[in-house]
């Protein structure tokens, strides 16, 4: 299928119905059928099970257990850097936020305000800051970790579309990350500077979860919902798990204006691993 036809199909497919169906299957304890499906998935996507804490496909009761598998201790060392990569995946884009606009792909951008569910005051804090967008493929490790130490301030669930998230849709779907379902997590670092981690949903991404809340979706809510954690003193260390995707999608990171130098090896489409140096 050509890229143009694939993008066109994204406007036609019953994305929510497909995602709900996939979510039910992913939670199903199918015994030998589930194990066979996991083995096929491993072969299809060349998943490196040698890194998994449990490499036996039969050890996973459900697809969700497999998707969110833990890694062996020590296989993702956390670099001594100001910011480290929060996930395994590939760089979609990164760079400067230009007067509140975030680059998506050639000829396409979107506003930080739209990404942050219309919160103009929060978006203004990143108007000329920095961003990094990282895509997780189906073969990747699906847990999300902290790029630096942080204290949780708030979380917002944003209902939206469920377009597939990959390089083709980034090039072909306008404002992709600001229109898909997402979870916006706002932190402050040890210097009391804000930073944001946006977990972006997609077709067949059955749910997103955080370590402090558990599963955020489903259920899928019809309106924006916000939780304030300022009074709970929830602190996470650099490299500590903060959430997870079921299957895979994208994380968008926002940082305020100021000196920040991304790893020069990071370019669009560069493969990255959780814990490696992201910025200094």
UniProtKB/Swiss-Prot annotation:
Location of this chain's protein in the cell: Cell membrane
Active site: 88, 145, 249
GO term, biological process aspect, one: phosphatidylethanolamine biosynthetic process
Gene Ontology MF term list: phosphatidylserine decarboxylase activity
Cofactor note: Binds 1 pyruvoyl group covalently per subunit.
Record pathway: Phospholipid metabolism; phosphatidylethanolamine biosynthesis; phosphatidylethanolamine from CDP-diacylglycerol: step 2/2
Membrane-topology annotation of the record: Peripheral membrane protein
GO cellular-component term (any): plasma membrane
Site (Cleavage (non-hydrolytic)): 248-249
Post-translational modifications: Is synthesized initially as an inactive proenzyme. Formation of the active enzyme involves a self-maturation process in which the active site pyruvoyl group is generated from an internal serine residue via an autocatalytic post-translational modification. Two non-identical subunits are generated from the proenzyme in this reaction, and the pyruvate is formed at the N-terminus of the alpha chain, which is derived from the carboxyl end of the proenzyme.
Cofactor(s) of this protein: pyruvate
Modified residues (Pyruvic acid (Ser)): 249
Functional note: Catalyzes the formation of phosphatidylethanolamine (PtdEtn) from phosphatidylserine (PtdSer).
Entry's family note: Belongs to the phosphatidylserine decarboxylase family. PSD-B subfamily. Prokaryotic type I sub-subfamily.
Self-association state and partner proteins as the record states: Heterodimer of a large membrane-associated beta subunit and a small pyruvoyl-containing alpha subunit.
The protein, known as: Phosphatidylserine decarboxylase proenzyme
Organism of origin: Chromobacterium violaceum (strain ATCC 12472 / DSM 30191 / JCM 1249 / CCUG 213 / NBRC 12614 / NCIMB 9131 / NCTC 9757 / MK)
Gene: psd
């Amino acid at each position: 299928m050509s890229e143009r036809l694939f993008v066109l199909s994204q406007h036609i497919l019953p994305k929510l119905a497909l995602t709900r169906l996939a979510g039910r299957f992913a939670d199903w304890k199918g015994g030998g059928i589930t194990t066979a499906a996991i083995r096929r998935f491993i072969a299809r996507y060349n998943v490196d099970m040698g890194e998994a804490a449990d490499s036996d496909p039969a050890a996973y009761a459900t697809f969700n257990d497999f998707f969110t598998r833990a890694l062996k201790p020590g296989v993702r060392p956390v670099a001594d850097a100001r910011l480290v990569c929060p996930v395994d995946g590939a760089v979609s884009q990164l760079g400067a936020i230009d007067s509140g606009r975030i680059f998506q792909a050639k000829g396409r951008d979107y506003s930080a305000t739209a990404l942050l569910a219309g919160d103009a005051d929060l978006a203004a804090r990143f108007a000329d800051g920095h961003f990094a967008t990282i895509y997780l493929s189906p073969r990747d490790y699906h847990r999300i970790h902290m790029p630096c130490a942080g204290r949780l301030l708030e979380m917002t669930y944003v209902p939206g579309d469920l377009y597939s998230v990959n390089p083709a849709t980034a090039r072909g779907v306008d404002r992709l990350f600001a229109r898909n379902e997402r979870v916006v997590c706002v932190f402050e670092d040890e210097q009391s500077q804000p930073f944001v981690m946006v977990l972006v949903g997609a077709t067949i991404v059955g749910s997103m979860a955080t370590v402090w809340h558990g599963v955020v979706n489903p259920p899928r809510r019809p309106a924006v919902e916000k939780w304030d954690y300022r009074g709970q003193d929830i602190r996470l260390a650099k490299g500590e798990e903060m959430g997870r995707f079921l299957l895979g999608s994208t994380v968008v990171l926002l940082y305020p204006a100021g000196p920040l130098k991304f790893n020069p090896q990071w370019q669009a489409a560069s493969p990255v691993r959780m814990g490696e140096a992201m910025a200094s």
